[in-house]
Regions:
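C-terminal interaction appendages of subunits in large macromolecular complexes
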Residues: 2-5, 9-10, 14, 18-19, ...
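Helix-hairpin-helix/helix-loop-helix acidic hairpins
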Residues: 20-32
């Protein structure tokens, strides 16, 4: 399928730069499309990913936006960092056996369950990957199997998750909460498996290694952007300097002289620049001279030396800043991440609470009951 998309403001900041993007013709040959996007953010870790192929599978859990940026800055500063999953669905997470997302690791995720009163429980969040429908079905199933004892379960979810569980008479709410975690989808176990393609080969990495690769890639992309910017500024400085000399030294008058042919005019202009060539940052080309001669004479006479001087000074200041950024690329990359956090980090605080769960014994919480009513 062919998919077109409009990038968001965030995507324009982190995933799109026409000057550093490799392009190819679209399926019908009418437009260009990116081969890959120059991603300057650990999007794979932020959004998570899951997939399966022949003999391989991957499951990368999502992580918190701000924590990823904090970790990136720590890595750039040579400090230790740790990363733990964070889910938009909230809930609680036991990351004791996370193993930084590598094969063999495991995390437990729980819903938030509140005691509304002695006879009523309210589930305020669902574990990652579980819907309220699945959650309710698992509760009914546990009740049918005699593992919990409830009267009914009701889905009052609107903007926020709210699943109400009405308990049977004489049933302990504390024991029921433990039983819900033990026998229903109020608690699920997830097994991460960070398998990614690196240099055309599948590799099993930790989330720390993934972040390091992303940060190194981002730094390289920023370096490339700075060098492109530097080249553009140098070109502008070169032409502005040529314009100033062309006007200030009255080299344009060569256009008024009678020469045998156009080539002689170009050669005469080039020779007139000889005393000033050492001041320039690159050689004068034929294209430079042609560009100068294409300017209408009336515009040449209107050139303002003071304005050209101001342009050149501004370009020199920008070149100085770009050189400083290239010489201090780590600081520049840190500033890039901090700017992202300032622009987009608000409202992206951690939603999943990190906790260490107590082991629940099945025999201590199983209850024989009657059939519930589901609404």
């Amino acid at each position: 399928r062919y998919i077109e998309a409009r990038p968001s403001k965030f995507a324009l900041d982190v995933a799109f730069n026409p000057k550093t993007t490799e392009w190819q013709l679209s399926y019908d040959g009418r437009k260009n499309e990116p081969v890959t996007l120059p991603m300057k953010f650990p999007l794979l870790l932020a959004q998570g990913a899951e997939g399966i192929a022949v003999g391989l599978s991957t499951k990368i859990l999502p992580h918190n936006f701000n924590e990823l940026i904090d970790a990136a800055v720590k890595y750039l500063r040579g400090k230790r960092f740790e990363l733990y999953p964070d889910f938009q669905t909230g809930g609680m997470l036991d990351s004791t056996d996370y193993e930084q997302g590598k094969r063999g690791g495991r995390v437990k995720v729980r819903a938030h369950i509140e005691e509304l009163d002695k006879k009523t429980l309210v589930i305020r969040s669902v574990p990652y990957g579980v819907t309220t429908t699945q959650l309710m079905e698992s509760i009914v199933k546990a009740n049918d199997q005699g593992k919990i004892k409830i009267k009914k379960v009701t889905d009052n979810t609107a903007a926020a998750v709210e699943v109400q569980v009405d308990l049977a008479t004489g049933v302990s709410s504390d024991i029921t909460i433990d039983a819900l975690y033990k026998f229903t989808d109020c608690e699920v176990s997830l097994s991460p498996n960070a398998c990614v393609i690196v240099e055309q080969r599948p590799q099993f990495l930790s989330v720390q290694e993934l972040l390091k690769q992303s940060v190194d890639h981002t730094k390289d992309l920023l370096d490339n952007e700075l060098r492109i910017r530097q080249a553009e500024l140098l070109e502008k400085w070169h032409y502005s300097s040529l314009e100033k000399i062309f006007f200030e030294e009255k080299i344009y008058k060569e256009l008024e002289k009678k020469h045998e042919d156009w080539e002689k005019v170009i050669k005469a202009i080039d020779s007139a620049f000889d005393p000033f060539k050492k001041k320039l940052k690159r050689a004068i080309t034929r294209e430079d001279i042609l560009k100068l001669t294409e300017k209408p004479v009336r515009r040449i006479y209107r050139l303002d030396i003071a304005e050209l001087d101001a342009q050149i000074k501004q370009l020199e200041a920008e070149l100085k800043q770009v050189k400083h950024d290239l010489d201090n690329l780590v600081d520049y990359t840190v500033a890039y991440y901090e700017n992202l956090q300032k622009k987009y980090g608000k409202g992206r605080e951690r939603k999943t609470e990190l906790k260490q769960f107590e082991v629940i014994q099945a025999k201590q919480v199983a209850i024989v009951n009657a059939e519930p009513y589901v609404k």
